[in-house]
């Protein structure tokens, strides 16, 4: 071969043949350009070079997995018989170096900056896009980072016992028009359609509200109550006490004395006929009722000295002293000679009578010695 490079036409492209050293330099320049392009756009695949084996590289090999390009090992440069080297691969211009953009899939979108909302989940990557990236020897981009869902924190609630208090059973509905009133006599329900009588804070059937003695109907009539039992007027009067003097029924005020009942107008003094009422009274020998004044005037003893009745004075009790068959006031029981008060006890200060006269002991001795009363 001559030192001057020769020009040949292949596939309508001008190819300049260069020595092997220049081939290494050109390959190194192409590799650096591809690396710089990859640094600038990491998501784009490196542009494949158009070589005679390009048409075969695009076809899948029967021994490789579909969807993944088979890796080819470049063959060693074939040596010629004249000791030279085969011509270097043709140098492609800028238009041939770049791949056909129509044949490549669109580049994947850059990872989103904003995090997806909780409601919108990220859409899964299409299977066709992943297959295309695998053919270009590129790994699919990692899925965008997802923020942990900030849902409401679930905390274990307090344990509840297995047996809970059951709610009270619902009250049975009362039938409309039904009555809950009970007759106090027959203990049966009083229907709203029946005649009823309300008395003594109770409910009665009209036919059940009768006198408990003579069974007389009392509905609409006056009645009396005794021990919680309704009575008609005649039966009620029969239960009342009668006056011990006139024998009539005591209806209003009553005075009880001597085990009997009296009208106030019938309980009077037998001497002056004055109503005694709630005053003290005295009884005669035949249980006659006397006021105190008439009783003392009639039955009180009379003092043998002052000849006045011995009766209480000014609310004070009066005591009578009996001696020799005579009655004396305490103040009138004295010695007839020296007028000293005599004692009722049998002592030296007591009474020493002589011929129906009252003497003390010294006067009694003196009268007895003189032989006169």
Curated annotation (Swiss-Prot):
Main subcellular localisation: other
Annotated segments matching region Disordered: 41-119, 135-176
Free-text tissue specificity from the UniProt record: Isoform 1 and isoform 3 are expressed in heart, kidney, lung, pancreas, placenta and platelets. Isoform 2 is expressed in brain, heart, kidney, lung, pancreas, placenta, skeletal muscle and platelets.
Protein's cellular compartments: Cell junction, Focal adhesion; Cytoplasm, Cytoskeleton, Stress fiber
Segments for region (Filamin-binding): 1-70
Keywords: Cell adhesion, Cell junction, Cell shape, Cytoplasm, Cytoskeleton, LIM domain, Metal-binding, Repeat, Zinc
Bias (Pro residues) ranges: 104-114
Region listing for FERMT2-binding, in residue ranges: 276-373
GO MF annotation, one: filamin binding
GO biological process: cell-cell adhesion; regulation of cell shape; regulation of integrin activation
Gene Ontology, cellular component aspect: cell junction; cell periphery; cytoplasm; cytosol; fibrillar center; focal adhesion; stress fiber
SMART domains: LIM (SM00132)
Segments forming domain LIM zinc-binding: 181-242, 243-300, 301-370
Subunit-level organization: Interacts with NKX2-5. Isoform 1 and isoform 3 interact with FERMT2, FLNA, FLNB and FLNC. Isoform 2 interacts with FLNB.
Domain notes: The N-terminal region is intrinsically disordered.
Protein's job: Serves as an anchoring site for cell-ECM adhesion proteins and filamin-containing actin filaments. Is implicated in cell shape modulation (spreading) and motility. May participate in the regulation of filamin-mediated cross-linking and stabilization of actin filaments. May also regulate the assembly of filamin-containing signaling complexes that control actin assembly. Promotes dissociation of FLNA from ITGB3 and ITGB7. Promotes activation of integrins and regulates integrin-mediated cell-cell adhesion.
Protein's name in the database: Filamin-binding LIM protein 1
């Amino acid at each position: 071969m001559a030192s001057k490079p020769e020009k040949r036409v292949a596939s309508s492209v001008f190819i300049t043949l260069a020595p092997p050293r220049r081939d290494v330099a050109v390959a190194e320049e192409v590799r650096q350009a591809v690396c710089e392009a990859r640094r600038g756009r990491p998501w784009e695949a490196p542009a494949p070079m158009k070589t005679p084996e390009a048409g075969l590289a695009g076809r899948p090999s029967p021994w490789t997995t579909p969807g993944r390009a088979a890796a080819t090992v470049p063959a060693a440069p074939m040596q010629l018989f004249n000791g030279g080297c085969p011509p270097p691969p043709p140098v492609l211009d800028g238009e041939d170096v770049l791949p056909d953009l129509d044949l490549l899939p669109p580049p994947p979108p850059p990872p989103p900056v904003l995090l997806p909302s909780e409601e919108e989940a990220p859409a899964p990557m299409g299977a066709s896009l992943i297959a295309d990236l695998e053919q270009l020897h590129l790994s699919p981009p990692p899925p965008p980072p997802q923020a942990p869902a900030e849902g409401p924190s679930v905390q274990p609630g307090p344990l509840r016992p297995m047996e809970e208090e059951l709610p009270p059973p619902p009250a049975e509905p009362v039938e409309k028009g039904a009555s809950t009133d009970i007759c106090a006599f027959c203990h049966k329900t009083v229907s709203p359609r029946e005649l009823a009588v309300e008395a003594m804070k109770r409910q009665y059937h009209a036919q059940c509200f009768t006198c408990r003695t003579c069974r007389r109907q009392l509905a609409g009539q006056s009645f009396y109550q005794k021990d919680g039992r309704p009575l008609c007027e005649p039966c009620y009067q029969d239960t009342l006490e009668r006056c011990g003097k006139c024998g009539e029924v005591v209806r209003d005020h009553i005075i009880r004395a001597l085990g009997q009942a009296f009208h106030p107008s019938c309980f009077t003094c037998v001497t002056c006929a004055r109503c005694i009422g709630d005053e003290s009274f005295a009884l005669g020998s035949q249980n006659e009722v006397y006021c105190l004044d008439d009783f003392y005037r009639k039955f009180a003893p009379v003092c043998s000295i002052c000849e006045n009745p011995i009766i209480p004075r000014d609310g004070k009790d009066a005591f009578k002293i009996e001696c020799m068959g005579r009655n004396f006031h305490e103040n009138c029981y004295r010695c007839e000679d020296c007028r000293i008060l005599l004692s009722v006890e049998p002592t030296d200060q007591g009474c020493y009578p002589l011929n129906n006269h009252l003497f003390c002991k010294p006067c009694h001795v003196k009268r007895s010695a003189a032989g006169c009363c």
